[in-house]
Design a protein with these regions (language model features):
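Structural/interface elements that position substrates and couple domains in central-metabolism enzymes
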Residues: 2-505
């Protein structure tokens, strides 16, 4: 359905390794119109952005509970994204996940032929609903995270994406923002852009509907459920927008079991998302300090935390780790602080929230320095096996993974680094392939073996422990707290074993 006249670049799928030629002339009108013709009478839902959230949100909408939709995902024809478009249209879902519902829902969509992908903004002219699931990034001034005190928020790409909707959309379309945005964005940025575009086109600007309902997507074994079977907060920029958002969400979310929560306005829903994530980021930063204290005091911080968790009011106290990763916790407190000053005119930052991000950003560097202090040999030329590259256990998401900072420091020191992750084949940010055969890797020997992600494959795994024991004398470094006391005892009989937060070892 897509035409290619002149070849500009290549987009390579990390899922299959297949390469796709990116067309310079971006015209997919015929493909879009042919798809819509297959679904007469159905409302068209366009999902803007085919990343970890948007691609799966498209699946959920294609498998809506109470209405049949024609779903079209749109992304940019870039080297990073074009392969996703082609993959969806060729019957290969672009996200690898441990959730069996992903494949089930995708197979259902293939049978119904109700999920298409494109790069052509013409698609917005067909949309009854546009769900915005694109990135809105924070740029930290220090790329190596050793001095992350400065940051900037550039809304230009986000604004351009909203303009693309406004230039093409129907006058009464519902634009539902799921992207995590600075509080104030829907009212102060999204709606004004859409209204201006409609006015320039000679269309009324008062029929457009704009709402915000943030996603709580958790890649992993409950990927689909984190969208369809989970609580949602929502609001609109006016009453008709709010009603339209609620009506749409009720068709895709199991609201009988997970009731919707309506807030007073979109400023409130946008604040709810960044506050929710800032709370978690602050908890993690808090524990970073205490884990260091425990190491200095000869204390097992895990033992301490588990004792405190017996108190019902303290069950959510965090455990230490390599650091914070993923797309949300690494930036959301900064979005909130930026909004306070730039959209609402305050002279004050959200100082504590910003500090929490800075502490978390430095954690991979601290983990590396802890390794240096405990290993007591030069790292240059040492062979290091990293167990896990994703930012979270049992998922294949490497965005802003704290493993990257740790990896970079090892690379700077001249280490030979070998990677394993059961959920990641290709580490896009580092442009390296990842081995998924741990048994094969452990046939070789290593100077250092570090557990850097808490995958279940590394937990309570008797076979893994035996293979580690069979290794020549090594330095085993658990940055997550995966190893049990019994496993540490067995491993310590042969190897040096160190765990972040375990000052008793």
């Amino acid at each position: 359905m897509m035409t290619t006249d002149t070849i500009q670049n290549i987009s390579k799928s990390p899922v299959t390794g297949k390469e796709y030629e990116i067309p310079v002339i971006q015209d997919d009108k015929a493909g879009i119109d042919a798809f819509i013709a297959l679904h007469p009478g159905k409302k068209v839902v366009v999902v803007q952005g085919l990343g970890f959230v948007g691609s799966v949100m498209g699946l959920v909408v294609a498998n809506a509970l109470t209405e049949e939709y024609a779903v079209i995902g749109i992304d940019l024809p870039t080297t990073a994204s074009y392969w996703k478009i082609r993959s969806i249209n060729e019957g290969i879902f672009p996200v690898i996940a441990s959730d069996p519902k992903i494949d089930q829902y995708y197979q259902n969509a293939l049978k119904k032929k109700n999920y298409y992908a494109t790069y052509d903004a013409h698609v917005y002219s067909k949309a009854d609903v546009v769900v915005v699931d694109i990135n809105l990034d924070v740029k930290k001034k220090s790329s190596d995270k050793q001095d992350p005190e400065g940051y900037s928020v550039d809304l230009s790409p986000f604004k351009k994406a909203i303009e693309a909707i406004g230039i093409n959309c129907k006058e009464d379309v519902l634009v539902l923002v799921e992207t995590t945005v600075p509080p104030g964005t829907s009212k102060k940025i999204v709606r004004p852009i859409l209204e201006e575009c409609l006015t320039k086109r000679g269309l009324p600007a008062d029929k457009i509907k704009v709402g915000h309902s943030y996603e709580r997507v958790m890649p992993g074994p409950k990927y689909i459920d984190s969208i369809q079977n989970f609580y949602r907060v929502f609001a609109g920029t006016d009453e008709k927008s709010t009603e339209a958002v609620e009506t749409f969400l009720r068709t895709v979310i199991r609201t009988d079991e997970y009731p919707l929560t309506r807030l007073g306005n979109t400023n409130a829903t946008e604040m709810a998302k960044v506050l929710e994530n800032s709370f978690r980021a602050m908890n993690i930063a808090f524990m970073v300090e205490w884990s260091r204290f425990a190491e200095e005091a000869g204390v097992d911080i895990y033992e301490v935390v588990n004792a405190i968790r017996m108190r019902p009011t303290h069950k959510n106290i965090m455990l230490p780790g390599l650091g914070v990763g993923g797309y949300c916790l690494t930036k959301d407190p900064l979005l909130a602080s930026w909004a306070r000053m730039n959209l609402f005119g305050s002279e004050e930052r959200l100082g504590q929230s910003e500090k929490g991000v800075h502490i978390n950003d430095k954690m991979p560097l601290y983990a590396f320095e802890f390794l240096q202090s405990q290993y007591k040999e030069a790292l240059a030329g040492k062979k290091v096996l990293l167990l896990g590259v994703s930012y979270l256990n049992d998922v294949g998401d490497t965005r802003y993974t704290p493993v990257e900072g740790f990896y970079d420091q090892l690379e700077i020191e001249g280490c030979e680094i070998v990677l394993h992750d059961p959920h990641v084949k290709y580490w896009e940010e580092k442009d390296v392939w990842v081995n998924q055969d741990l048994d094969e890797l452990l046939k070789d020997s290593y100077n250092i073996i570090a557990i850097t992600t808490g995958h279940k494959d590394y937990r309570n795994n008797e076979s893994l422990i035996n293979k580690l024991i069979d290794q020549p004398v090594s330095f085993l470094y658990d940055t997550i707290g995966v190893l049990t006391n019994e496993e540490i005892k067995r491993l310590s009989a042969k190897h040096i074993v160190k765990v972040i937060g375990r000052g008793d070892l």
